[in-house]
Amino acid sequence: MSGISLTPVKQENEPCSFLRHDSGSTQAVNDTYVDRARPSADAKEHCAASDPEEWHSGDRPPRLCRKPSRFYRRIVIPETAPVLSPRYDLSDEPHAPGTTMISGPRTQ
């Protein structure tokens, strides 16, 4: 990452840019970073292919969105992202026989 500086920018009302949800939570903020060290040749192709709906699936890597004179990397957190994943049980409650505790080390 040497030679690359990422600067947060807030440019609302632009596609591939900054989105803030009504909740105001920092978990629901879509930040845009500008990489000033990269060229931005195919702006139309990348920005036109950016569909906000597909970011909510969580199974794709972040898409790069290039616009004239700037290079954007989108970091998107779904509106409904939980603080902790429901897969992990962090409670101290005893687990029922036959279930697996995956949250921490097992003590004998």
UniProtKB/Swiss-Prot annotation:
Biased composition (Polar residues): 1-10
Highest taxon above the source species: Viruses
Organism: Gallid herpesvirus 2 (strain Chicken/Md5/ATCC VR-987)
Region (Disordered) residue spans: 1-63, 83-108
Ranges of compositional bias, category Basic and acidic residues: 33-62
Protein name as it appears in the record: Uncharacterized gene 82 protein
